[in-house]
Amino acid sequence: MKTKFIFITGGVLSSLGKGLAAASVGALLQARGLKVTIQKLDPYINVDPGTMNPFQHGEVYVTDDGAETDLDLGHYERYLGIPMNQRNNYTSGSIYHRVITKERRGDYLGGTVQVIPHITDEIKSVIMNLASDDLDVALVEIGGTVGDIEGQPFLEAIRQLRSDLGRDRCMYIHLTLVPYLAAAGEHKTKPTQHSVKELRSIGIQPDIILCRCEKAVTDDLKHKIALFCNVEKDAVFSAVDVKNIYEVPLSFYEEGFDQKIAIMLQLPAKNPDLSKWQELVDTCANPQGKVTIGIVGKYVDLKEAYKSLHEALIHGGVANKLAVELKYVNSELITDENVAESLAGLDGILVPGGFGSRGVEGKIRAIRYARENKVPFFGICLGMQCAVIEFARNVAGLPAANSEEFDEQTPDKVIYLMTEWFDFRSKQVERRDSGSEKGGTMRLGSYPCAVVKGTNAFTAYQAEKVDERHRHRFEFNNAYLDKLKEAGLVFSGLSPDGELVEMVEIKDHPWFLGCQFHPEFKSYPMTPHPLFREFIKAAGKQAVKSKR
């Protein structure tokens, strides 16, 4: 079977949940035995989100091949349980960059380079590159909202693909908002009508309309939407708000959403096996206990900045049959005087990754509190670096210890800029310096890690070698390895050549671990990451202890 394409657009307003909708549809088709992938096309001009402010964009999701991508790729991976790569995310910036590179190379033979056909052809090219003999369905999510100026080339490209592929290989799903007005006691369809009108004005007639709503849309209202939007009566579906995002595939299945897609695209009529999804939802709904985890960071005002982290902690809870309540603590507000009050009642403390000096001292205070008060601690990327700094200052007798990122003049740079490292994918030595460009110049993607036996890390992984995803410029300074080891710091994970420290721990503590990589990017609801599983297990023991 030739690869078939499903294009998902959004109307009325942004953040309706196109990514979750795409991931849920993909999961349903996958449960039918089909091979599925998902692609996200973002209309913004940035080449990738790697240098974007988390407050504007949210999390930057890193793939195995080192691509810095949209956070929706995290949803795709978690719902499908398969890794994404660079081909699964493009932006206007990356598309234009490809076209301009070709123009400079002379590929267009002196012709005038225009949005149509050159930009639209490039968009079609990256979409069609997904097609292969072993892929049944490719879902393509168009970022932004219908009507956005920057999104027009993408919509034009997918309009053309309908003619290129034919109706049996291409369909359009339009996600739109159907607000419920409590005062009037009814849903309003006008925003949806206008959104579809805008879409049809550029030549795209949606095949299915998915209505994001607080309450399920009635059959009468579905028929009204179908009439005004020129779709079949049974092609209007509700996307109702749910308590748990992992309920969405089950909700779509109950609506018959996947069945309609299968009929329209003439896909094999096999009933999906959703037993694992049902088991997951049941486990989430019936926990045997609860833990409270504090996330100490500086992007706490925008939870999307820690999206994968949030989900990975939930996964750890699922593995231990525990509900996980998250408390976000602004590290900039933590002082020596209020640290105990700020972190009171927590069963576990997690310090996530980040960049820059703002809020770092608050993180270090939180880590000291966790270490001295025997509260389970998990440090990720910058969180591990801060744990090393705290240990060096307060245990190893290096009061001026710091990271070169925060203080270039410190006499004890226990964390310093990585200037070269061996890339196990390209089999080459990568080099960077302080003058390198910011975008795409970090240690990015999946790298192997040797795990030391007899450590918390080995207890979690039960393996001597693992592969984890990285996103950092700074690393532990090996000049301090012996001194910190003598003071009691355990180096439980190293690069295979022994040159780079990947994990550290502390003995005589319930659970204290820092890792230089980002394990949250490899945690799936069906297969929680081992480190999150063990962290939540330790937090569960702490919760029981606190109740006594």
Curated annotation (Swiss-Prot):
One of its GO terms (molecular function) is ATP binding. ATP binds at residues 15-20, 72. GO terms for biological process: 'de novo' CTP biosynthetic process; pyrimidine nucleobase biosynthetic process. Allosterically activated by GTP, when glutamine is the substrate; GTP has no effect on the reaction when ammonia is the substrate. The allosteric effector GTP functions by stabilizing the protein conformation that binds the tetrahedral intermediate(s) formed during glutamine hydrolysis. Inhibited by the product CTP, via allosteric rather than competitive inhibition. Pathway: Pyrimidine metabolism; CTP biosynthesis via de novo pathway; CTP from UDP: step 2/2. The keyword Nucleotide-binding applies. PROSITE patterns: GATASE_TYPE_1. UTP binds at residues 14, 188-193, 224. Gene3D superfamilies: 3.40.50.880, P-loop containing nucleotide triphosphate hydrolases. GO terms for cellular component: cytosol. InterPro entries: Class_I_gatase-like, CTP_synthase, CTP_synthase_N, GATASE, GATase1_CTP_Synthase, P-loop_NTPase. Residues 292-545 form the Glutamine amidotransferase type-1 domain. Mg(2+) binds at residues 72, 141. L-glutamine binds at residues 354, 382-385, 405, 473. CTP binds at residues 14, 148-150, 188-193, 224. Keywords: ATP-binding, Glutamine amidotransferase, Ligase, Magnesium, Metal-binding, Nucleotide-binding, Pyrimidine biosynthesis. PANTHER family: CTP SYNTHASE, CTP SYNTHASE-RELATED. Catalyzes the ATP-dependent amination of UTP to CTP with either L-glutamine or ammonia as the source of nitrogen. Regulates intracellular CTP levels through interactions with the four ribonucleotide triphosphates. This is CTP synthase. The gene is pyrG.
